[in-house]
Amino acid sequence: MLATKTDAVPVGAEWSHEVKWDGVRILAEVTDGQVRLWSRNANDVTVAWPDVALPHEALVPGSTRPRDLLVDGEVIALNERGLPDFRVLQDRMHVRRASTATRLAAGLPATYMVFDLLRVDGEDLTGLPLSERRARLAALDLAPWQVPEPYDDGQMLLEATRAQGLEGVVSKRLSSRYTFDARSPHWRKLAHRHRRSYVVGGWRPQEGTSDRLASLLVGEPTADGLVYRGRVGSGIGGKVSRMLTEAVAGLTRASSPFVDEVPRVDAAGTTWVEPVLVIDVDTHGVGYARLRQPSYRGVREDLDPADLEDQS
C-alpha cells in the first residue's frame, strides 16, 4: 500500500501521523521460524539484509512455537550526521552474495522500522482498519525490529521533523484497509522542502554547447574549506541561465575550489569559478552529504560565503 502526495498534513481525529523514513520499503514474512524479505516489486531480497532477516527465535524471545507473520515497514540506516539516508543504503540494496552482505552489514548496520501488521498466525488482517492492525502490532514483541510510535498531532510532527532534518510525515486514515500495490488516498505523504544558501564553485553548459549555463556546482563553507554538496540544474533556463552566465563571467579559475573530490560524473565539462557567488537552493531534507532534488531559487547578493557559517 502506497501513499499519495499531499501539500498539507490532514487534520482530524480520523487521521494518525508517522515519521516519513528515508529508507527502503520491505515486507517481512516469518513462516516456520524463517524470515524472508520482499521488495515492493515482490523480489526476494533476504540475502541483502542479514541484520534484518534474523532467525525467528531472535524476534520472539522465549517463543515455543513458530509464529506466522507478515509485516510492512522500511529498512533504514543512518548517515554520518545521524539521520536516515537512502543513499547510504544503495551499496547494500542489490547485493546477492551472502558473504558480501554480511561484511557490509558489519560496517553499515540497518534497522527495520515496522509500521503495519498484515498477517499473524494465519489470520489475514488486511481487511481490518488500520487502528486495529496497529493495536495488534503494538502487542507483539518484535525486537530488535522497531515499531515507531504514531502521533495524533500531524502539524506538531511536521514541524518537529522539519527541525530535525527528517524527510517528512506520512498521514494515515485510521479506518483504512490495506491493499497490496495500491496507491491510496487514505495514506498521504508530505516531504519537506528546505531552502538554504550555498556557494557556487563551478558551472556546466547545456549539452552540445560550451557557453549556455545549465547547472551550478555548489558547496558549503566549513572549517576545512568549501565542501561539495551537489549540482543544481532545476530552475535554471532561459533568462535565469543568461543572468547566471553573466554572474560567473570573470570568475573562472584553473582548479576546483572544493576541498573534497567532486564525483567524476559532476566534474566532467565543468568550468571552475572562484567561490564568491551565493545562491539559494530548495532541497528535500537537510543533513545529507548531497543535495536531494535541488532547485535553484535565486542569487543572494546580500550574502557572502562567510555569512553561511550560521546555517550549520
Where are these regions (language model features)?
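Catalytic cores of nucleic-acid ligases and guanylyltransferases
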Residues: 1-312
